[in-house]
Regions:
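Hydrophobic "anchor" residues
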Residues: 21, 271, 278-279
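Radical SAM/AdoMet-radical enzyme domain recognition
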Residues: 76, 80, 87-219
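Short Fe-S-cluster ligation motifs
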Residues: 93-114, 346-374
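N-terminal pre-core extensions flanking Radical SAM catalytic domains
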Residues: 1-81, 98, 371-374
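Short, small/polar residue-rich loop motifs at catalytic or cofactor-binding pockets
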Residues: 8, 264-268
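Short cysteine clusters
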Residues: 67, 71-74, 264, 282, ...
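C-terminal accessory region of radical SAM enzymes
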Residues: 228-258, 278-329, 335-337, 366-369
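Iron-sulfur (Fe-S) cluster-binding segments and ferredoxin-like electron-carrier domains
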Residues: 76-85, 286-291, 324-364
Length: 374
């Protein structure tokens, strides 16, 4: 059964029994340029353009702080957390977000499959025409989860691997999902303890035609775990980042202008829900708005007022440089300083120096690899 999704005067239909099967109406098809292939990103751009105002089209939801793993670099794990959502408790919130045009949702944690009502919540999202991506460690993907995903396939499943036991459930789950026709992305968080496993995990993914990403960036969260102390550094970090960004990194012909606040697409079309059901733009943004008691509409209204106040404000300390891809600075990662003249948005002290130093080491390493000793 197809589910109609409507935003303003445009509509499309979704088949919940497929990972991503959309049928666009004539207005939306024309707006997208009559392309044979339409990305979800382009679809959301078109919906925002047609609506003429921001809409919560994309949801990232950290459903729980609990996890069945004990990684020493986790930014969110807190197994004392007792606020896992129940289907009945979050239904009004989800109904409202969906009614405003929600296109896709990403369910994460902690480990989202620990949530008792995960199947009911997932089924409701899918049967409402939402495209759902799952972030998981894969260890809880059993026969029941596979049956659910076979009936109502997710848009994609991203499994983060933490060891090289290729007979363990996470790896077997990745193969089972792929055999169901579900897109699987293998991921690996590079810490000092686990760095030696990167190559073998990457080879396994390549052998089984599973796309793979790794990330050496660790950051501290709100759970008291000093994740950053586990990060790879020195020459090993240089080598990892050269692999991540490629030998074209730091092209000196690239022009980067100074950053301004909230220029990302997320500011107009994304919402984030914390495990406590607090609303924000993304998980990096520390400013949150409670939905409990006030409901989604009031929290979203207050968030939009804050965004409009700070949108396009210069980020102080950023002059624009060729290390922008490595820098990853944005409003969420900046320091917000209240002053009599309003909120100042500033690059944290020492950030630019740290990024520039790493960027120059990367360019030097790339020149060495190319045999250019300038």
């Amino acid at each position: 059964m197809l589910v109609e999704k409507r935003v303003g005067d445009v509509a499309y239909e979704v088949n919940p029994a497929r990972p991503c099967a959309l049928a666009l109406d004539d207005n939306l098809y024309e707006l997208l340029g009559e392309s044979d292939e339409v990305s979800i990103d382009n679809l959301m751009d078109a919906l925002i353009e047609r609506a003429g105002k921001p809409r919560p089209l994309s949801l990232m939801w950290h459903m729980t702080r609990r996890c069945n793993f004990a990684c020493p670099f986790c930014f969110i794990r807190d197994n004392s957390f007792d606020g896992d959502p129940t289907f009945d408790s979050v239904l009004p919130l989800l109904e409202r977000i969906i009614s405003l045009g929600l296109v896709r949702a990403t369910l994460s944690g902690g480990e989202c499959l620990l949530v008792k009502d995960f199947p009911s919540i997932y089924r409701y999202l899918k049967e409402s025409g939402v495209l759902v991506t799952i972030f998981t460690n894969g260890s809880l993907i059993d026969g029941g989860v596979l049956n659910l995903f076979s009936e109502l396939p997710p848009f994609s499943v991203e499994i983060t691997f933490y060891d090289d036991d290729f007979e363990s459930r996470p790896y077997r789950a990745a193969l089972s999902l792929r055999n169901l026709g579900i897109d699987v992305l293998g991921k690996f968080t590079v810490s000092r303890e686990k760095a030696a496993l990167l190559h073998s995990v990457e080879r396994w993914c390549a052998l089984h035609d599973i796309p793979f990403l790794f990330d050496p960036v660790l950051f501290n969260g709100e759970n008291g775990i000093d994740a950053e102390s586990q990060a790879v550094n020195g020459e090993a970090l240089v080598d990892l980042n050269v692999r991540r960004f490629g030998v074209g990194y730091g092209d000196e012909n690239v022009v980067c202008t100074p950053l301004r606040s909230l220029q990302c697409k997320a500011a107009d079309r994304a919402v984030f829900l914390s495990p406590e059901l607090e609303l924000s733009i993304c998980h990096d943004m520390k400013r949150r708005w409670a939905t409990a008691g006030k409901g989604f509409d009031e929290a979203y209204r207050l968030m939009r007022l804050w965004i409009e106040e700070l949108k396009d404000v210069p980020i102080e300390g950023c002059s624009g440089c060729i290390d922008r891809p490595l820098c990853n600075m944005c409003t969420a990662r900046s320091e917000l300083i209240e002053s009599p003249h309003g909120t100042r948005i500033c690059v944290p002290e020492g950030h630019c120096r740290e990024v520039a130093t790493l960027g120059e080491k990367m360019r030097r390493r790339i020149r060495e690899q190319k045999g250019d000793m300038r």
